[in-house]
Each structure stands twice: as C-alpha cells, then as structure tokens.
C-alpha cells in the first residue's frame, strides 16, 4: 500500500467529535475511459465545515459532485467504490437520486437564481415537491437563515436576478435551505463575489454549521483557514499515459493542515511553492 493510501486510511479513521455523515471508501471517478480521481478514503464529520483545497484539476469538484450524485448528469461519468450517507450506499441502484439531492443540497460557483421573484425562488421547489406547510413562513424562515431577510423583505415580488451578486448567492443558499437539507455542498461559492460579499457568505456558513454539514470547494486557502473545521488537500499526479489525475493527499483538522501538515505535498502547496 502506498504512503498516500495509508495516509488517507489513517485520516478516514480519525475520531471526530461528531459522527460521520459520509464515509468514502476507495472511490474512483472516471470520465469515459479516463480515471480522473483515484482511490479516495475519507470520513466527513457531521455539523462541521469541511474545505477541499488544491490546484486546478485535482478532483475537488469531482468528489464534491459525488456526494449528491451530480456526476450522474455528466455523460460518460462513472463512480466506483463505496460512498455511504448515514449508512446508506448512495450508489445503490435502489437510491432515488432526486430525493438524495433534497437531503444533500448544492450551491454553485456562480449565483443562479431562478428568473422568478425572490419569493418564488424560495417557494417554487417546495411547492413542486408537495410541501403542505405555510409557504409564507417557509420563505421568511429560509431567507432569515440565509441572513438576507432584512434586505429583501420589502421587495419579495422583485426578480431575484435584480439582486447584487452577493445577495443572489445568499438567495441561492436560502433556496437550498428551503428544501430542509441535511448537508450543503458549496462549489467555490465566493469565487465570483467581492470581498464584502465573501465575508457575508463566510459568516453565514459559520452560523449554518450549527444545523448543517457544509462541504466547500475553494481555491482561497485563507477562506479555508477562516471557516473550515477540517481541510482536505488534493493534488494531481501523472498517469502512465502522461495525463494528470486527481488524488486526495491529506485530510486533517484545519489548524493542523495550515500549521504542521503531515505531507510534504501539502506543506509545499500551502507555503506557495506550487499551485
């Protein structure tokens, strides 16, 4: 067994203060015949923020999409290995991927509000999925949880697309919250935002982790160090055909990752020697 595999397995059995919400065991991801991500072993602790960092093309977003089977929507994508969500193998043929995505919501890199009113951005999906409660209360609660209610409460009929970029991203977070998820996946949620909006989203994440597990892909190492409880460092390696493929190198508490990483690769990346 390689050092990398041993290190991953050691990381996967770390005693988190919270139980694992996801167990990743030997996951590989292919795009067509290309092996894009190799042999990942990882435990995701509940009600904490986990950051995925690493250079472009290292598999961060590829793994993130595995957690709610968004890779199913990519032609030719194939996932091998076991990925358990609260003791259920989510790649079992009996798992309903649509229901899974209600429990494991996703916020994308660029804000993508529906071309509808602010109110309908929140109410549309719950209504379409048979929500029987009070929609007005759900809309207000979701917007409050996303720390945007006070900014939009007097213009709920206005288009969501008319909001600023930072407001749109918080609206998208509110939209995800409205589906009552267990986990929130965030794929570089601040990459298109200005510093003030970025700070607002980071502060929101710190509040939301009291109720949700948050897994965040970020190219901003300072962001990872500010908000994450745990950090996973990914890197690339050259395969036998000269192509780069992604791998998980190290998974550690964030303070340890940024002060005394276990691997030379992580140390060199964090110190700015590459990436």
From Swiss-Prot:
GO CC field: plasma membrane
EC number(s) given by UniProt: 7.3.2.1
Annotated ATP binding sites: 54-61
UniProt key word Glycosyltransferase: no
Record membrane topology: Peripheral membrane protein
Record-given protein name: Phosphate import ATP-binding protein PstB 1
InterPro entries: AAA+_ATPase, ABC_transporter-like_ATP-bd, ABC_transporter-like_CS, P-loop_NTPase, PstB-like
Main localization category: membrane
GO biological process, one term: phosphate ion transmembrane transport
Pfam families: ABC_tran
Subcellular location(s) per record: Cell inner membrane
First-tier enzyme category under EC: translocase
Domain ABC transporter residues, every copy: 22-261
Reaction catalysis annotation: phosphate(out) + ATP + H2O = ADP + 2 phosphate(in) + H(+)
SMART domains: AAA
Organism, as annotated: Trichormus variabilis (strain ATCC 29413 / PCC 7937)
């Amino acid at each position: 067994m390689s050092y990398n595999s041993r290190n991953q397995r050691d990381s996967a059995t770390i005693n988190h203060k919270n139980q694992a919400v996801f167990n990743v065991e030997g996951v590989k991801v292919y795009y067509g015949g290309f092996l894009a991500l190799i042999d990942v072993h990882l435990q995701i602790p509940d009600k904490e923020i986990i950051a995925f960092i690493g250079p472009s093309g290292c598999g961060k977003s590829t793994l993130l999409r595995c957690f709610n089977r968004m890779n199913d929507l990519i032609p030719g994508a194939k996932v091998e290995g076991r990925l358990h969500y609260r003791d259920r193998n989510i790649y079992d043929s009996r798992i309903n991927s649509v229901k899974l995505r209600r429990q494991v919501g996703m916020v994308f890199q660029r804000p993508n509000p529906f071309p509808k009113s602010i109110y309908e951005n929140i109410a549309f999906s719950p209504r379409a999925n048979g929500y029987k409660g009070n929609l007005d209360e759900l809309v207000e609660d979701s917007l409050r949880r996303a720390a945007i209610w006070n900014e939009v409460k007097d213009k709920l009929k206005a288009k969501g697309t008319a909001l600023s970029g930072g407001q749109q991203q918080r609206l998208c977070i509110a939209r995800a919250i409205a589906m009552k998820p267990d986990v929130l996946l965030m794929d570089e949620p601040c990459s298109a935002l200005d510093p003030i909006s970025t700070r607002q989203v980071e502060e929101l994440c710190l509040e939301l982790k009291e109720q949700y597990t948050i897994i965040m892909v970020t190219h901003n190492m300072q962001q990872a160090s500010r908000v994450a409880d745990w950090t996973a460092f990914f890197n690339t390696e050259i395969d036998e055909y000269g192509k780069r493929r992604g791998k998980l190198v190290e998974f550690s508490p964030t303070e340890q990752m940024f002060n005394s990483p276990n691997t030379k690769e992580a140390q060199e990346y964090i110190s700015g020697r590459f990436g």
